[in-house]
Amino acid sequence: MGSTAILALLLAVLQGVCAEVQLVQSGAEVKKPGESLRISCKGSGYSFTSYWISWVRQMPGKGLEWMGRIDPSDSYTNYSPSFQGHVTISADKSISTAYLQWSSLKASDTAMYYCAR
């Protein structure tokens, strides 16, 4: 097999590996202040316990804010001081899913939330 064919095969394999990694979040929800909420982030295509999962927030018209992260292998968490005590980050490694949870929402929690590996 020529070097060009080997390179093309290697690139095809690498593209396939990268394309399999996914984080799929639960859908949008409409909630009232004072209600609870849990959003999920399901990982696939990689070893879920080998990577931290971070959560970030984007308020309307604003930039991204890092909220915190979890190590799914042992559920160790770090929080931004701005979010400590207001949200809870957890994970269930048996189903490769991380969660972001509020026990009592505020109107100021209106935003887009994203998980990231």
UniProtKB/Swiss-Prot annotation:
GO molecular function: antigen binding
Record carries keyword Iron-sulfur: no
Subunit text: Immunoglobulins are composed of two identical heavy chains and two identical light chains; disulfide-linked.
Disulfide bond entries: 41-115
Keywords: Adaptive immunity, Cell membrane, Disulfide bond, Immunity, Immunoglobulin, Immunoglobulin domain, Membrane, Secreted, Signal
Domain named Ig-like: residues: 20-117
Gene3D superfamilies for the chain: Immunoglobulins
Cellular compartments annotated: Secreted; Cell membrane
Region annotation (Framework-2) ranges: 53-69
The name this protein goes by in its record: Immunoglobulin heavy variable 5-10-1
Signal peptide range: 1-19
SMART domains from the UniProt entry: IGv
Pfam family, one: V-set
Region (Complementarity-determining-3): 116-117
Span list, region Framework-1: 20-44
Region of interest (Framework-3), ranges: 78-115
Residues in coiled coil: none
Annotated region (Complementarity-determining-1), positions in chain: 45-52
GO terms under biological process: immunoglobulin mediated immune response
Function statement: V region of the variable domain of immunoglobulin heavy chains that participates in the antigen recognition. Immunoglobulins, also known as antibodies, are membrane-bound or secreted glycoproteins produced by B lymphocytes. In the recognition phase of humoral immunity, the membrane-bound immunoglobulins serve as receptors which, upon binding of a specific antigen, trigger the clonal expansion and differentiation of B lymphocytes into immunoglobulins-secreting plasma cells.
UniProt main location, coarse: secreted
Keyword Cell membrane: yes
Region ranges (Complementarity-determining-2): 70-77
GO cellular component, one term: plasma membrane
